[in-house]
Curated annotation (Swiss-Prot):
Pfam families: LexA_DNA_bind, Peptidase_S24
Keyword Magnesium: no
Organism encoding this protein: Delftia acidovorans (strain DSM 14801 / SPH-1)
Name of protein: LexA repressor
Molecular functions (GO terms): DNA binding; serine-type endopeptidase activity
């Protein structure tokens, strides 16, 4: 029998909301977004439930960031398995995913070129709502406030289109970067989630392409 904490109905709602937000945008929700979605009067009410989930070992709270919520993947997997679901998919229909881990990407070459693949990971499908195609090792702290830290493994679904606000893997010139996409009347901007880093404004003459969408995250402590 799987060992997992018992959640209240409200705690399960919040966990489902966190998982759905990470799958949809690549980042967890803010306290204000949780409060608004679930009808709490204030973000403080959401914080109380998050603290309870942290005490039960379901999530880890990262101080100093508005989106500092990180899933403890082993515990979440057990909870999903006990419910007989994996983000709405029948558990019995799922097999382990074999995902290539992409390290540094050479200028001008495809992300999934063989020379970029460091190794292949066997990953539980229950960690994701949207099936990823590969893992990308995060370098740097430009997405810190989205809960994406240096050394984390970002789960990426290959895609060439994205909605405003989604976290994307983008190619700009000879560089590949992970940022939040924003389209304006003036053009495309790539937004960091750390005030120490500048907004990247894509010039019309620059070579720019979306390579993928962030659909999940594996903490660096899990990737060793």
């Amino acid at each position: 029998m799987l060992d997992h904490p018992k959640l209240t109905a409200r705690q399960q709602q919040i966990l489902d909301l966190i998982q759905a937000a990470i799958s949809r945008t690549g980042a967890p929700p803010t306290r204000a977004e949780i409060a608004n979605t679930l009808g709490f009067k204030s973000a403080n009410a959401a914080e109380e439930h998050l603290q309870a989930l942290a005490r039960k070992g379901v999530i880890e709270l990262v101080s100093g960031t508005s989106r500092g919520i990180r899933l403890r993947t082993d515990t979440v997997r057990n909870i999903n398995a006990a419910r007989g679901t994996s983000f709405g998919l029948p558990l019995s229909a799922l097999a382990p995913l074999m995902l290539p881990l992409v390290g540094r990407v050479a200028a001008g070459s495809p992300i999934l070129a063989q020379e970029h693949i460091d190794q292949t990971y066997s990953v539980e499908p229950s960690l994701f709502q949207t099936r990823p195609d590969y893992l990308l090792r995060v370098r740097g702290m430009s997405m810190r406030d989205a809960g994406i830290m240096d050394g984390d493994l970002l789960a990426v679904q290959s895609a060439h289109e994205a909605r405003n606000g989604q976290i994307v893997v983008a190619r700009l010139g000879d560089e590949v970067t992970v940022k939040r996409l924003r389209r304006t009347t003036q053009g495309v901007e790539l937004l960091p989630e750390n005030p120490d880093y500048p907004v990247i404004r894509v010039a019309p003459e620059e070579a720019f392409a979306i390579e993928g969408l962030a659909v999940g995250l594996i903490r660096n402590s899990m990737s060793m």
